[in-house]
Every structure is written in structure tokens, then in C-alpha cells.
Amino acid sequence: MKKILKGVGFTFIAVAVLTVVSGAAFAKSLTVGVSWSNFQEERWKTDEAAMKRQLEKLGAKYISADAQADSSKQISDVENLIARGCDALIILAYDADAISPAISRAKAEGIPVVGYDRLIEDPYAFYLTFDNKEVGRMQAREVFKVKPEGNYVFIKGSPTDPNADFLHEGQLEVLKEAMDAGKIKMSVSNTPMVGSPRSLKRTWSRS
């Protein structure tokens, strides 16, 4: 991991990617390949539209692939984006560990890689994200305002997503005092095998 940038907007992401690949922020005729982990989560559809708009606004060509929550498919997707002539890659990793072969392939081709939102443990990949621990704190503060006592159910994100741990750490920081005092009890702490709305609903119903 070369760099962590937190709380960044899509304009900054687009400029950063073009700067990494070309040395000039407003480079023209560059193709940026984006590998998305899945579009089951509505957020990624929104992010894609914003990212595509900003890259094209800066003169870059946008191409993408949806891994459909499949780590093997994501590796194939990245290889396909490379074959299509991308000059830089943005990867939202479905599995931060399993994506390693794709990073190695990009490195061999001399193609810069930016890990978007989810940490890729590879020194070749830059890392762009939000302050996920602070997001967890914000979530906990708002819930605590509404329910300062009682049983809490924590449904963490996918085990393949490092951000799930950061969010949970932030939540526990805010709630620790109340938990130590016995005002809040962690009745269940579950991690769905797949971070999709359907799996989350199943986990919630079992809690």
C-alpha cells in the first residue's frame, strides 16, 4: 500500500488517478479501467455514476466490469480490462486477499493500481478511502441518542472487507463506556458470509 487518502471526493479521486498514470492531472486520451466488487449494494451504483462522470469530465475514457461478488471473476475482469488497453486501474476488491494475482499482473504490465475504499495489502496499490472508523463512530452516536440502554445487535460486513472491522472498532469506541457500565449489552455480533441485502436480512432474522 503506497498511500492512504481519507475523506476524498470523486473529483479528487479522478484527478489522483490521472496524475498517477500520467504525471499530469488533466491528461487526455487515457483509459481508466474500474473493477467493481458487485452492484448488489446500491451504493456502488451511485459511486460508479459519479466516478464515470468525473473521469470523463477530465477527458479520460471509462471502462468497467462487475465481479458479481465473485473473487475469481474479479481477477478475470481485471485481466480483461488490461487486455482492453486500460492505462490505469481502480479496483474495489471483493476479496482483499484473493485479488493479489490481478495486482501482480497489472504490475507486470506497468499499469498503476488504485484500491478504492477497500484496503488491498500490496505495496504496489495506492489506497483511496473514507475514514471508516469515524463512520462507525457516527453510526454509534446516532443509535445511542435514540437507544442509550438495552440489547444491541451488531451485524458486521463481509469478512472479505477490511472496512467492516474499522467500522465496528469505531462503533465500540463510542459505546464502550455504556457497555462497561452494563447499560448496553451486545446480544449478537454476526458477520454475514456475503454482504448483500438478502444475507443481511437473513442474519437479522436469526439474531
Segments predicted by a language model, with ranges:
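Bacterial N-terminal signal peptides
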Residues: 10-21
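A residue-level marker of the well-folded mature domains of exported/periplasmic proteins
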Residues: 2-9, 25-207
